[in-house]
Amino acid sequence: MRVIGIDPGTAIVGYGIIDYDKNKYSIVDYGVVLTSKDLSTEERLEIVYDEIDKILKKYKPEFMAIEDLFYFKNNKTVISVAQARGVILLAGKQNNIAMTSYTPLQVKIGITGYGKAEKKQIQQMVQKFLGLSEIPKPDDAADALAICITHINSLGSKLSFGRTNNLNKIVVPSGTNKISLEEYKNLLKK
């Protein structure tokens, strides 16, 4: 199973791609998509869309896990992240990829088992899960790998994060139908 994790943003989008087979995590690729603050919002979103679309076409993941929006003190920031998420989700839909979202709290719990884990603790667990000699850099790519691992781990556990729209109902490639988590797990076994 191949999963891409995405840490969305307008200036920096982190991505991480992991193959998971027989309880083994294998890194395929990770990195960031960067846009210049000197560009218009529309130009930045076009770059995010185009680059994520290229990554999806190159690596052909079966699933996309993307960080959900959370509380931002700055309304301008939340709007720009929401716009970036929108073009990333569009790229996923157009590439026929099943998608789901995780909040930062869900990722912390999914990686460390502790909702108040520090960024460094999460990065160390990503390093451990993936058997790396050092923590992946930059931070946005490490965050994307954490989102990816959270999704992989959620498929094999009965853990509920308390948000039915994330794990109990997952958008399937058609984009219009919803299936239960049990049906989703059965699809993975085929």
From Swiss-Prot:
InterPro entries: RNaseH-like_sf, RNaseH_sf, X-over_junc_endoDNase_Mg_BS, X-over_junc_endoDNase_RuvC. The active site is at residues 7, 67, 140. SUPFAM superfamilies: Ribonuclease H-like. GO terms for biological process: DNA recombination; DNA repair. Pfam families: RuvC (PF02075). It is found in: Cytoplasm. Binds 2 Mg(2+) ion per subunit. The RuvA-RuvB-RuvC complex processes Holliday junction (HJ) DNA during genetic recombination and DNA repair. Endonuclease that resolves HJ intermediates. Cleaves cruciform DNA by making single-stranded nicks across the HJ at symmetrical positions within the homologous arms, yielding a 5'-phosphate and a 3'-hydroxyl group; requires a central core of homology in the junction. The consensus cleavage sequence is 5'-(A/T)TT(C/G)-3'. Cleavage occurs on the 3'-side of the TT dinucleotide at the point of strand exchange. Its EC number is 3.1.21.10. Mg(2+) 2 binds at residue 67. Homodimer which binds Holliday junction (HJ) DNA. The HJ becomes 2-fold symmetrical on binding to RuvC with unstacked arms; it has a different conformation from HJ DNA in complex with RuvA. In the full resolvosome a probable DNA-RuvA(4)-RuvB(12)-RuvC(2) complex forms which resolves the HJ. One of its GO terms (cellular component) is cytoplasm. It comes from Fusobacterium nucleatum subsp. nucleatum (strain ATCC 25586 / DSM 15643 / BCRC 10681 / CIP 101130 / JCM 8532 / KCTC 2640 / LMG 13131 / VPI 4355). It is an enzyme of class 3 (hydrolase). GO terms for molecular function: crossover junction DNA endonuclease activity; DNA binding; magnesium ion binding. It catalyses: Endonucleolytic cleavage at a junction such as a reciprocal single-stranded crossover between two homologous DNA duplexes (Holliday junction). Keywords: Cytoplasm, DNA damage, DNA recombination, DNA repair, DNA-binding, Endonuclease, Hydrolase, Magnesium, Metal-binding, Nuclease. Mg(2+) 1 binds at residues 7, 140. This is Crossover junction endodeoxyribonuclease RuvC. Its cofactor is Mg(2+). The keyword DNA-binding applies. Belongs to the RuvC family.
